[in-house]
Structure formats: C-alpha cells, structure tokens
Amino acid sequence: MAEVSVKQLATDIDTPVDRLLQQFVDAGISKSKADDMVSESEKQTLLAHLKKQHGGDEVAAPARMTLQRKTKSTISVQGTGGKNKEVQVEVRKSRTYVRRSALEDEQRQAEAEETARLEAEEKARREAEEKARLDAEEKARREAEQARREAEEKARIEAQQKARQAQQPAKAAGSTAQQEAEKMAKREAEELKRQQEQAALTKAEELAAKKAEEARVMAEQNAARWAEEEAARAKESSDYHLTTNKHAQAAEDELDRKEETSRRTAAAAKGPKKAGRREDDRDARNPRARKGKRGKVATPNAMKHGFNKPAAAVNRDVVIGETITVAELANKMAVKGVEVIKVMMKMGAMATINQVIDQETAQLVAEEMGHKVVLRRENELEEAVLSDRDETSEAKPRAPVVTIMGHVDHGKTSLLDYIRKAKVAAGEAGGITQHIGAYHVETDSGMITFLDTPGHAAFTSMRARGAKATDIVVLVVAADDGVMPQTIEAIQHAKAAEVPLVVAVNKIDKPEADPDRVKTELARYNVMSEDWGGDCQFVHVSAKSGQGIDDLLEAILIQSEVLELKAVVDGMANGVVIESFLDKGRGPVATVLVQEGTLRQGDIVLCGLEYGRVRAMRDELGREIKEAGPSLPVEILGLSGVPSAGDEATVVRDEKKAREVALYRQGKFREVKLARQQKAKLENMFANMTEGEVSEVNVVIKADVQGSVEAICDALVKLSTDEVKVKIVGSGVGGITETDATLAAASSAILVGFNVRADASARKVIEAESLDLRYYSVIYDLIDEVKQAMSGMLAPEYRQEIIGLAEVRSVFKSPKFGAVAGCMVTEGVVKRSNRIRVLRDNVVIYEGELESLRRFKDDVNEVKNGYECGIAVKNYNDVREGDQIEVYETVEIQRTL
C-alpha cells in the first residue's frame, strides 16, 4: 500500500493532527510535521501500541480449564459354576488445559522468584566473604602491632646490654660506640618488624582466601541441590504420560481387587465344601474332573504363566531414520500399531499401518507417547566422505570463468571463434550451437575460460547451468536485431545467479546497426550502461572484423579484478559437470569445469549418481594432460556411467566409500522417481478421467550428449496440447541399440536419433517391425516434424459452406410427395445430394434433406442459378410462398498446431 501523510491519516481516522503526532511519539515513531509520510509498517506499529495501551491484547478467556470425560462399558466375567456375569466398568479421565499467557506469567513469576533467591544468596555470599576479609585484616593488623612492640622492646633491651658490655673494656670510646650500637639495634629492630608484618599479612590473605573458597563451595553445593529439586519438580509436572499410566494402572489394579473380592464372596455364600478334600488338590490331580462349558477341560492353575504387568510405562530410546513406516515405529516403541494410529489421529493425521511417515512426524508421535527420540540421518556416510578433504592451503587468484549468452544467431560462437582464432560455428549443424563448449584462452593479461551456451529456446536448462558455474556473463546482443526473447532469458539467468553482466553489442560494422537502441531496450530490464549511471559495461564489437575484441577482453579482466576471484589450488579437486556423453570407444565421458583444487589422473571422483577413477584427462583440444587446476575445463574418462549435466564432481579418498555413496544416491533417486509417479493427487483426478480421450505421440530419443537429451525432451513435452500429448517413452545418451528399438516397437513410438545412428542389431529390429526411425542434426527440424506428426493425430474440423439458394414462388400438391415447392434458384447451385435449410423471414424453421428435385417433370441432380425447379422436402409439408431454401455442404478441414 502507498504511503500517506500524517494529515491525510488523521483525516481518515477522524482525529486531530496534534493528537496523532503525540500518539506517534508515544509509540516510538519520530513524526514532527503534518506533511511527514507514514508507511504501512509504521501504521501497524501505531495500531499495536494503541491496542496495548487500551488493553486490546487481553483475551477474555479463563486461564485454566479442566475437561472431564466419562466412558462406561460392560465386560463379561466368568464366575463360579461356568456362568458369565456382566460387570459395569466406568473410566473417568480428566485433562487440564492452561492458557499459554497464564503459563508464561507463572513461568515469568517463577523465574523472577528464582532470580531474587539467587541474588540474595549471591549477596549473602559476598557479605560473608567481605566480613571474613575484614576480620582477617584486623587480626593481622593487631598481630603486626603486637609484634612491632615486642621487637622494639627486645631491641631496646639488647641495645642496653651491648652498651653496658662496651662500657666495661673501653670507657674512652664510650660515646661513639654507644651511637653505633644504637644505630645497629635500630636497624635490626626495623628488619624484624618488617619480616613479622609480611608474615602476618601473608597469613591473613591465606585465611581470607580459604574462607572465600569455603563460602563459594557452599553456594555451589546449594545451587546444585536447588537446581536438582527444581528439575525434579518440573519433570514430575511435565511427564504427563508417566503419571497418566500410573493412575491407569492403579485404577485397573483396584478394579481387579474388587472383582476378586466379589467372586470370593459369592463362592462363600453357596456353602462350605466337603471336609477332607481341597478343590485345588483335586483339580491338580485330575484335570478332567473340572469341566467348563460344553465339556471342555479347563487349564490347570499350575500351567498358567506368572506374567505381571509392568507398574510404570517403559521409556525407550527410539532410533528414527529419515522415513519409517507406522508398523516399524510401533515395533521400536514395543506397542501395538493401533496405539500409534490412535495417537496420530488425535494429532490430526490419518495413517495406515503400512504408510511411510517422515522423520518429523515420527518424532512428534514418539515424544507424545513418552519416549526419547534419537534421529539418524541416512546420508551420514555421504557427509563424512565429502567432509574428509584436505583443503588447508590458502586461496590464490584464479582465472575468471566467462559465459557467452544471448539470442540465437546473434554471433556468440563467432565472437568466441575470433577470440580463439578457430572455426567452430561452421562445425555446428545448421550454424547454431547445440552444446555447451568450454574453452580457455591465454591473453597478455592472463587466462580466461569461456563457456559458449546455445541461444535456441529449447536449451533453457543448458543456459541456466552455464550461468550457475560462471563468474561473469557476456551478453551478446546484435546491434541490428536488438533485444530478443532469449536475451531477456539470459538476463534473468544472470540475475538469478547474481553474476555481473558485460554487454557486447555485436555486428557493429553493419550499416543498419543501432547501438543506442540496444541500450534503451536493455534499460527496460534494469541493465543500465555505465554512461547512463549504471554498473554494466557496454562494449561495441564485431566478430567479423575483430573490432573491439581487445576492449571486450580488457573489460572482462577489469570485472574479474573487481570480483577478486580466488580458489584453493592445492588439495582435492571440486568442480561441476558441464556436459556428458557416451563414446563408443572410450565409454562415459564428462566435461568437468574444475572450480577449486587440482584434478589429477588417478583421482577417485564422485560425480552425482556415478563414481570412478580418472583413467585419462584431455583438454578442449583433445590433448592428454595429467592435471588441471581451477577454472580449467577438462574431459575425464573412467566413470561408471554418464552423469547428469550440472552434477557436482568431487574427489574423494576411498573408492569403496564412493561406490556406497553413489549406490545410496541411486536408490534415493529411484525412490523419489517412483513416489512422483505413484502420487495421485485430487487435482489430477479429472485429467486422469479424460486421459483415454487424448491422443498420444510416443517418442524414444537418443542423442550424443546429455544436454541435448534434456533440451529435446523439454521442447517436445512443451508441444503437448489438450488433444495430443507427446510422451517420452525413453531417452538416453549414445547410439540407438537393439533395446531402444524393442522399446519403440512395444510402445508404438517414433525413434529419434540426434547426431547418433543405429547399430546393426537395432537396424534388424527396425526393419522387422517397420518402425519409424528419423535422424536429425538440427533441433529446428526435429521439433517441426514432431509437430506435423501431432497435427495428423488431431481430430478434423468440419465447416458448413452454403452452395445455393432457391426462392419459393408457388406451392403444389403432389399425391406422391405432398407439398412441392416451385422455386427459382437465385444464388449458386442446388444439388440433390446435399442437405437443406428452410428459411422463413430469414429464420431457420426446418433442417433436413431433399426428397425430389425436378425440372419440367424430369429428375435432375442439380439446378444452376437463374433456372426454375420443383423441390420436395423430405418429411416436411409446411412450405409456403416466399420461403427460401438454402442448400449447404459439410467440408472437412485438417487442423494444425
């Protein structure tokens, strides 16, 4: 919604502007003038603030609600004497629901109380530590003062003694010796005082640290005990299933005790048994003496098992994979499948016992039944293999990967051809590119890797793959043709991959070239030139004369410097499959663009659903190489099969693990494919009902590379209409084999070979079965011929053309034909074999056929314009003068797509 001003909003809600500005300020939104604009998010913020201010968020609902359910049932219990009696069983269940806001308030209150308690404990601990420290310091100070006084007294006494001793032998030097003795005594007293103070201070610090440690340990012990008590209370309140099971078991045991008491009371009321014999002993000695209904021998008590029901529910660790059936889940939890289905129905999910459920649903069900869930990923091996890599080296600058994109016949391959100084466009059938070509060229400023993509509309997936694996997209636009559909699609691919664009305006040397028109048309799709303030470089080039090629390469290198492209050179390689095909002599061949690391001959490569050891590597010119670094395209041999274009190629350590991962991926791919085929949705029901009325053209496609197979399949499927559908019975890479021919014969399909041929065994089957085999090298021709085949299966269209018109001049009566109209042919010709319409006042009143056409009593086959004739209409006698008889014929028109 568009923004509105504060004044307009105040008018809409009928409130003064000053009040609305104050409300904005209260809500935390800075609005000071009536002309300020208000966005939709600010309106929502103001509305939420006003609701909260006026109590609009509160819901008038009870904070706690208890629901009670009572079910009654009757069970048949076998009593004494073989008679059954009916026992009424009543089960009462109670469940309490608490409003989330009330729970949150209680939780917040509990958290506040817990925080206050912890703060009080922390404060008490700090006070205890501070008190202990002050006591220790005071005690140390007193001890130091006492030690100082003792030291001074001791020093004074020793000084007096030394003075007296010095006076006896030498009274002549009395004054000088006495002064020196006093100085020495004073120094000794000060040293002793300092040592005693230091010892007292150290002792006080140790005592304070010890008391602080004791206080901390006491606080930690109390905190752990309090946390355990809190967790126990929370667990007891949250474990709903355990408490429910306990109550159910207690109720069941109480019911069993009541039944046993009533049965014993009834048996005692019948009278005492004969003395001297116990019934249990007699039954144990002679089992046949105790017979039940229909004379069957009852089971002795000694043969009955002594199993007791568990007193509480057993909580298990349930291991759940990515998918699991309901029966397997019930088996892991040791419950019946019916119980699991009941829980799922309560949760709102309908399932059968053999239905496969996903991991999240199974986790919810298991936790609902009180078990602990252990989730297991089935692709753990795959993740472990892909994560076991040595990528410790630092990243270094690498060459840019540039994709050439644009509309068909705009000169993409010719431009690249001039750069590579080789003739490639002439080698492509029809002069159009039908494969992704990967090449690298050395320039004066460095290496550049080019990917040449097809421009034809059928190769959308190829162009998307090229944009995904690239760093820079060069958009080639013909200066004389302008922006075309595939140009727009290339812009969309580049923006989806977030790749910068460099626009090359080609064919600039033509007289009708108009580069300004190209800039204007591209500006509609947010591709702005740097001259117009945008961020896209526009380079005028000519693939024919070579004009502007150096400028284009310089623009590419400048863009790559801005991107600061780096990659790990050393270590295990990682890349993407650009193209793949099946070579008759070499086997599966994949063109891989190395993105990081170094790919070496002999490495083990995991590539999508395939794996293998690299037996040989070749560059784009067919030369054997031993290793390839980042941004280099190479052909590798040695894979187990043809990988899909766009798959990630990764070097791994162990070939055995790579094989396991590839087999796991193949199994998952097969499961997904089968699930997609078997999924019958409600919206497809009517389409399936009318499926028998739709004609189908079955096609078996074989091509030279995987990308061409995808492009042809997509293009043919898009040709399908409501009346005729194209069904791809089979597709693959490589020559046409006997298996393909047999498949085409079984499904009455057309065999299509795109740049491939049939082998000898396949040709025998084709001749024997008279199959329709067609070879193509240009995708245009293939699509056109399939269109013609589909047109032949369309139901024809019928059109009615008026060939004559006769006017009734008079009406005669005939005993044989009834009313006969005497007519004048005014337009065209009246033929006896065609159908007619009778018009009165230009309104059709009858439609039928002629019974008789005569001229002068002679039967004729046709009467031309300007002649009179007699016309008898079959089964119609209400012909009047002035009516018109219109003669028409039905023409069949063949429809086309």
From Swiss-Prot:
Cross-referenced PROSITE patterns: G_TR_2 (PS51722), IF2 (PS01176)
Entry keyword Methyltransferase: no
Region (Disordered) location: 69-88, 95-304
Pfam families in the record: EF-G_D2 (PF22042), GTP_EFTU (PF00009), GTP_EFTU_D2 (PF03144), IF-2 (PF11987), IF2_assoc (PF08364), IF2_N (PF04760)
Residues bound to GTP: 406-413, 452-456, 506-509
Annotated spans, G1: 406-413
Entry's Gene Ontology cellular component terms: cytosol
Database matches in InterPro entries: DNA-bd_dom_put_sf (IPR009061), EF-G-like_DII (IPR053905), EFTu-like_2 (IPR004161), IF2_assoc_dom_bac (IPR013575), IF2_II (IPR044145), IF2_N (IPR006847), P-loop_NTPase (IPR027417), Small_GTP-bd (IPR005225)
Ranges annotated as biased composition (Basic residues): 287-296
Compartments, record wording: Cytoplasm
CDD domains according to UniProt: IF2_eIF5B, IF2_mtIF2_II, mtIF2_IVc
Residues spanning the signal sequence: none
Region (G5) location: 542-544
Segments of this protein annotated with the region G3: 452-455
Listed Basic and acidic residues bias regions: 101-161, 180-196, 203-217, 226-239, 277-286
Any one Gene Ontology molecular-function term assigned to this protein's record: guanosine tetraphosphate binding
Biased composition (Low complexity): 162-179
G4: region residues: 506-509
Residue intervals of the tr-type G domain: 397-566
Residue numbers spanned by region G2: 431-435
Keywords: Cytoplasm, GTP-binding, Initiation factor, Nucleotide-binding, Protein biosynthesis
Sequence similarity: Belongs to the TRAFAC class translation factor GTPase superfamily. Classic translation factor GTPase family. IF-2 subfamily.
Function: One of the essential components for the initiation of protein synthesis. Protects formylmethionyl-tRNA from spontaneous hydrolysis and promotes its binding to the 30S ribosomal subunits. Also involved in the hydrolysis of GTP during the formation of the 70S ribosomal complex.
Name of the protein this chain belongs to: Translation initiation factor IF-2
